[in-house]
Amino acid sequence: MEFSERKRSRKSQSFKLVSRDYHHEVYKIPEFSNDVNGEAKETQPIFLGDESMEIKKQITGMRRLLNDSTGRIYQRVGKEGEKLKEEPQDLDLVWPPRLNSSAEAPQSLHPSSRGVWNELPPQSGQFSGQYGTRSRTFQSQPHPTTSSNGELPVVNSSAGSNCCTCNCQSTLQAILQELKTMRKLMQIQAVGTQNRQQPPISLICSQRTAVSRKRNKKKKVPPKTVEPLTVKQKPSGSEMEKKSVVASELSALQAAEHTSPEESRVLGFGIVLESPSSDPEVQLAEGFDVFMPKSQLDSILSNYTRSGSLLFRKLVCAFFDDKTLANSLPNGKRKRGLNDNRKGLDQNIVGAIKVFTEKYCTANHVDKLPGPRDWVQILQDQIKLARRRLKRGSEIADSDERLDGIALPPTVV
């Protein structure tokens, strides 16, 4: 194939020109071509012949252009998942042999053109259009001549009307004019369908503003809380007195409510004993003769209830001082060494603290409740800390004694 010869590829979207030495009679229509917009424009023919034959060739080219457009739409708008139909091979459009113009008289322009138009609808993929340049912007729905199931009607390529076989120029020109108007209508419909697919900008803006309004409405404070503040009247003296009495009663009730949970905490897990002193004592657990001042227990419960292990540590420190912890063992047993004078901690006190901590943590949903093996470990940690504190205290005391032992030199007067 020479460089000047260009044929149409099966998969490409472009149409290629064919050199003029291509000897097929059907495709040799050099006087018809398309511009960029797909409009048919007439060029000067290479050879001078009958004018009616030239119009027939133009009609043939326009028919191929329209059939190619509709066929392309039908192939691209197939259902998803279905294999698109292949383009059939181009069929030869050969006009029937000319008859004598004197054999039939030319009919009127309008009826003849309408009759021919009904018999020459655009076909679906019958002619792929060698002479048309496909416009990439032309993508629309099938032409209204399609049937209900989406397929275009197929019409025989040969024209059945006698008027098409004759050489009446007025009829042929009318057919060509209607084909051109058909092309324009298809382009207008393509632009309309593209505009329908894109929503207008005003609609998008209105939807966005509606969404923003909904979000603002959610953030607004309900008006019920604002109404009593805005509607207020100046109360009289009697109303003020009534309000003061009601406020005092409410404050007393609130104070009772605040004190009752604290008392319930202690009463539920400890027994309060009446004593002549102002500060009553609380028995931590039943069956254990372990008592603690109520004020001290309340302060521990209000400050150290983040975890059960921390509460247990603070209660142990409240019952045992550093010297007792430093000279004790956590499990209550005596060390067997010769010079080891450590004794076990009082298991009565440790047991009461343990029972109180378990009940309090389970009732108030306190996290980090010590496990069965954690109690002894916590006691060992407290013993080590007490020893460190005593050691630091002894070192500080020794340093203070050394400073006191250094006497200032006497001054001679």
Curated annotation (Swiss-Prot):
Biased composition (Basic residues): 211-222
InterPro entries recorded: BEN_domain, BEN_domain_protein_7
Signal peptide annotation: none
Modified positions (Phosphothreonine) in chain numbering: T324
GO MF annotations, alphabetized: DNA binding
Region (Disordered): 78-153, 208-243
Residue ranges, compositional bias (Low complexity): 223-232
Domain BEN: 287-392
PTM-bearing positions, type Phosphoserine: S328
Keyword Phosphoprotein tagged: yes
Covalent link Glycyl lysine isopeptide (Lys-Gly) (interchain with G-Cter in SUMO2), residues: K16, K56, K85, K243
PROSITE patterns membership: BEN
Any single GO CC term annotated in Swiss-Prot or TrEMBL for this entry: extracellular exosome
Record key words, sorted: Isopeptide bond, Phosphoprotein, Ubl conjugation
Recorded superkingdom: Eukaryota
Residue ranges, compositional bias (Polar residues): 99-111, 121-153
Compositionally biased region (Basic and acidic residues): 78-88
PANTHER family membership: BEN DOMAIN-CONTAINING PROTEIN 7 (PTHR35068:SF1)
Record-given protein name: BEN domain-containing protein 7
